[in-house]
Amino acid sequence: MELIQDTSRPPLEYVKGVPLIKYFAEALGPLQSFQARPDDLLINTYPKSGTTWVSQILDMIYQGGDLEKCNRAPIYVRVPFLEVNDPGEPSGLETLKDTPPPRLIKSHLPLALLPQTLLDQKVKVVYVARNPKDVAVSYYHFHRMEKAHPEPGTWDSFLEKFMAGEVSYGSWYQHVQEWWELSRTHPVLYLFYEDMKENPKREIQKILEFVGRSLPEETMDFMVQHTSFKEMKKNPMTNYTTVPQELMDHSISPFMRKGMAGDWKTTFTVAQNERFDADYAEKMAGCSLSFRSEL
């Protein structure tokens, strides 16, 4: 009897000092052959920072606000995930080869691992940053349900790993700072999750201006409604329920969980919060970025 290899929850692999999901680390070699196009648009975030949200917004912009066109395929087909390489599924590179221009491309890669072609071609980047306390809580629940990640362990032990940058994609602190620095020399629209929650229409307008497009007022209002967390959570084309259960088990925790700012307060203890704040102050010293941990 043939033994079926268990491909779930392998340990992280380090590439240039950055820990990554094993399968994604294996994709980085082939990714060197990736050819960016000047009309590509890169959506980059640290995980759990609003990637799917801004991906849906941008696809709706590209489709002129037509929701039916946006429901043509799941979000991960419409906006291919550059470094994805899950067993038995098409890699990001394979999906991108079949994606007609202009392409929207999703990635969580830090600059050290990003294919140079994206910078050489001056590809526009929409970057979204979210306050790290909510990121840590969301990432913990994502680890519980997404089987390509190592087991998260207890919340307390996961939080320690997060602060030390010993989770997939490494340090949140380094990620948000290096993309902030890049925005001075490269076409990067740097957005904040909390600003998008506070006033989505204002932030969508910024995105429209950045990509050189415009939409009528009523289309904008329609987009705000249909890219809301409530709508996206129940839409199979955005909520990741089309992913095989062996990869994502929504019965453990849904991919789209709460989608709010300040939910960390239901999880962090007073002691954890004090420790986190002290660590944050040290790691973000001298950085001009400021985050709102609640609205």
Swiss-Prot record:
Which residues of this UniProt protein bind 3'-phosphoadenylyl sulfate?
A: 48-53, 130, 138, 193, 227-232, 257-259
Primary residence? cytoplasm
Annotated binding of dopamine, by residue: 86, 106-108, 146
Q: Which organism is it from?
A: Homo sapiens
User: What family, per the record?
Assistant: Belongs to the sulfotransferase 1 family.
The record gives the effect of mutating residue 101 to H as: Decreases levels of sulfotransferase activity; 2-fold increase in KM for dopamine
Q: Which UniProt keywords apply?
A: Catecholamine metabolism, Cytoplasm, Lipid metabolism, Steroid metabolism, Transferase
Class of enzymatic activity (EC top level): transferase
Q: What is the effect of changing residue 101 to L?
A: Decreases levels of sulfotransferase activity; 3-fold increase in KM for serotonin
Q: What one GO molecular function would you report for this record?
A: aryl sulfotransferase activity
The cross-references to InterPro entries, in alphabetical order and at most eight, read: P-loop_NTPase, Sulfotransferase_dom
Kindly provide the name given to this protein in its UniProt entry: Sulfotransferase 1A3
